[in-house]
Amino acid sequence: MENIERESMEYDVVIVGAGPAGLSTAIKLKQQAIEASREMSICVVEKGSEVGAHILSGNVFDPKALDELIPDWKDLGAPLNTPVKKDSVRYLLNEKSNFSIPTLFATTFKNHGNYIMSLGNFCRWMAEYAEGLEIDIFPGFTASELIVNDGVVVGIATGDMGIDSNGEKKPSYEPGINLMAKYTILSEGCRGHLGKQAISLFSLNEDSDPQHYGIGFKEVWDLDPSVHEEGLVVHTMGWPAAKGVLSGSYLYHGENNQAFLGYIVPLDYDNPHISPFDEFQQWKHQASIQKYLEGGTRTAYGARALIKGGHQSIPKMHFPGGMLVGDDAGTMNFPRIKGTHTAMKSGMIAAESLFEEFYKENPMTDLNTVTSNFKSSWLETELHKARNFLPFIHKYGTLLGVALAGIDQLIFRGKLPFTLHHDQPDH
């Protein structure tokens, strides 16, 4: 770090990222402190101008973790207003033709009891709840680097402001601040900047499989009310994906005639001429999708990396002075295309592990109890059941691999007596 005099602030816990994992960590910590009549200062740093500003996602949300974290969420007005009414899974043959796949054979796409929501709105609601618990949330601050002292993370430095495109200081330059903490929780999402630093610095992934990633394109549309079907969840596969590439796509009908759509391409394709963005544009012209978009208006769009290595690729979640949670750790359940409830639960597990140790006379800096707490949770059970889905496809190809993965999920419920592994990274 450049030798610049910086202001410092001290907290018991600093959390980087105000997504579902980071906010769940903060809320669970504060709930435990209040219940035990203890003081605990918590700060959440968020790079967006406001919480949710960098989260463009329609989301089919499993409320399992939320039921545990905030049991009275309905009474408190959580923005979960659209229960899933119907699932549709379709295989696209070409621009005109497709056929339906019964959800009996697509068990990972059954969404009864789930909700269609805006993840950005949900995170804003969680942030308001957290602030009501006197948790400090600082939007508009990037976390530029870890502060490490004698091999222990003791906080983070926020990014400097007033830097031009050449890296030179402008007249408006202001140095970042040091946020010092007894524990630092990294919840930045997929390929988080500080998460990568911690994984490299402490060799957290030396005993795990290589990680795997995808690129997801997302859009939000206002649909013509005559074609909007509130509560409908559509998942598709097939056309226009290139041969041998297991791309997937979705269209979720939310409230107020709004729809969320997206197209996901894994990064292990070997044809350099594939254009994931162009495939997304083609997909929107497939007859079963276009019928909903005609007469509608696109209101937002973006793209995001997503993490999909699964159970075998999760690194060690703890390091001296902190922990990884959510997609910094890789807790997404890719076969279900769901990561919000798993991210929340990982944050809650981290909070419980930290709280168990925090008030001891000589607390551990390396909270290794998070590993055993994770292994005894429903999160471990869920991710373990899904562990062979992607390796089957990587090992046996798209058609046979999907068939074997389907047998694993449908017949054996993810309980085959062996674990396949990712042999190499896909990036």
Model features per residue range: what roles?
Residues A21, E50, R191:
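Conserved Rossmann-like nucleotide-cofactor binding loop
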Residues E39, K47-K96:
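N-terminal FAD cofactor-binding segment of flavoenzymes
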Residues A78-V84, V89-L93, S377-H427:
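Ferredoxin-type iron-sulfur electron-transfer modules and their immediate structural context
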Residues Y129-I289, I349:
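Predominantly flavin-linked oxidoreductase catalytic cores and closely associated redox partners
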Residues A303-F334:
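FAD-binding beta-loop-beta segment adjacent to the flavin cofactor pocket
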Residues G330-R336, E352-G397:
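Active-site-proximal substrate-binding core of FAD-dependent oxidoreductases
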